[in-house]
Curated annotation (Swiss-Prot):
Subunit-level organization: Part of the RNA polymerase complex.
Gene3D superfamilies named among the record's database cross-references: RPB5-like RNA polymerase subunit (3.90.940.20)
Keywords assigned: Cytoplasm, DNA-directed RNA polymerase, Nucleotidyltransferase, Transcription, Transferase
Pfam hit, one: RNA_pol_Rpb5_C
Top EC group: transferase
Keyword Transcription: yes
Intrachain S-S bonds: none
Organism: Thermococcus sibiricus (strain DSM 12597 / MM 739)
Listed name of the protein: DNA-directed RNA polymerase subunit Rpo5
GN (gene name): rpo5
Lineage of the organism: Archaea, Methanobacteriati, Methanobacteriota, Thermococci, Thermococcales
HAMAP family: RNApol_Rpo5_RPB5
């Protein structure tokens, strides 16, 4: 009997790494850039990555993107209801 491998959206080569920031990390991020959560780009709860992370509205997602020209950079989005 062969075991089935469970795949997630993050296994796809084109999907960058996502993670939910802790409360402390969120506070540091907002302080560092002197911004409010409402000033961040939004990501909806229906997004497959948000669902895979089990993120809730108000959570901030850090997206780690890799680029051949820019190297590694981070992008932040706040989770909002559909």
């Amino acid at each position: 009997m062969t075991a089935k491998k469970s795949l997630t959206i993050f296994d796809h080569v084109l999907v960058p790494e996502h993670r939910v920031l802790s409360k402390e990390e969120t506070e540091e991020l907002l302080k560092k850039y002197n911004i409010k959560p409402s000033q961040l780009p939004q990501i909806k709860t229906s997004d497959p990555a948000v669902q895979a992370l089990d993120a809730k509205p108000g959570d901030i997602i850090e997206i780690k993107r890799k680029s051949p020209t820019a190297g590694v950079y981070y992008y932040y989005r706040i989770v909002v209801e559909d």
